[in-house]
Design a protein with these regions (language model features):
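Conserved SGNH/GDSL esterase-like catalytic core that processes O-acyl groups on lipids
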Residues: 21, 25-110
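Loop/turn elements at helix/coil->beta-strand transitions in domains of secreted/extracellular proteins
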Residues: 28-30, 87-90, 122-127, 165-168
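N-terminal, intrinsically disordered, polar/charged segments of Gram-positive cell-envelope systems
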Residues: 1-29
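Active-site segments of SGNH/GDSL-like serine hydrolases
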Residues: 94, 119-152
Length: 214
């Protein structure tokens, strides 16, 4: 008797990378922003008032999953608690500047763990890994830890976490950099934080954002 034919297993299709488009502010109504003092600035001075912000001045990847933070209209919660209470369509993470004194690979591993936590709790959310913003030339040239070459090295490692399908990388440094790749003097008063007049949330809107209708 002829041997029975064995059916080839059906391969799991790869997710199709979706197109990008610009959107209006309502797109961010189900967005969660996770970050440090720079994200605190977006929450306080930005125009995306319906978004949710898990942000604290000293937040970093080492405590992001355990630290309790005051979240508007929610209360003081840890990130896992927040992720279990609300459903988000997109999650933006800007962390790393406070951690620069640590090993960059270790920072990246902790960041990756944070991304995994978000993904497990919000399987349908789009995750945006955000580049850390540069510092001004006076700080970059004198600070052995908080300098732009080191920030660039960390950003390069964080960019590798994006897959272009469900996790994306956003770098807005070119909007604030001078010709030497430093934070422009006219954009910051402390060589670290951009002025409040630069609404970073509007920059998020102008960034190409994944089109959900495809």
């Amino acid at each position: 008797a002829a041997p029975e034919e064995t059916a080839e297993p059906t391969p799991t299709p790869e997710p199709t990378p979706l197109q990008f488009t610009t959107v209006d502010a309502s797109y961010f109504d189900d967005a969660l922003f996770i970050g440090d003092s720079r994200t605190v600035g977006i929450a306080e001075y930005g125009s995306l008032k319906n978004a949710t912000y898990f942000a604290d001045v000293g937040l970093n990847v080492y405590v992001a999953q355990t630290k309790a933070v005051a979240v508007k209209n929610v209360g003081t919660v840890t990130l896992p608690q927040l992720l279990s209470q609300k459903t988000f369509g997109k999650v933006y993470i800007m962390l790393g500047i406070n951690e620069l004194g640590n090993d960059l690979d270790d920072i990246t591993a902790k960041f990756s763990s944070l991304v995994d936590t978000v993904r497990a709790a919000q399987p349908d959310a789009i995750i945006f890994v955000e580049a850390n913003l540069h510092v001004g030339p006076s700080r970059s040239s004198t600070d052995a830890t908080f300098n732009n070459p080191r920030i660039d090295k960390l950003n390069e490692k964080l960019a590798a976490l994006a897959d272009g399908k469900t996790i994306f990388y956003i770098d807005i440094n070119e909007l604030f950099d001078d010709e030497n790749g430093n934070l422009r003097a006219d954009a910051s008063g402390d060589s670290t934080h951009v002025y409040a007049k630069y609404d970073l949330s509007l920059i998020h809107i102008s960034e190409p954002t994944r089109l959900l209708s495809i």
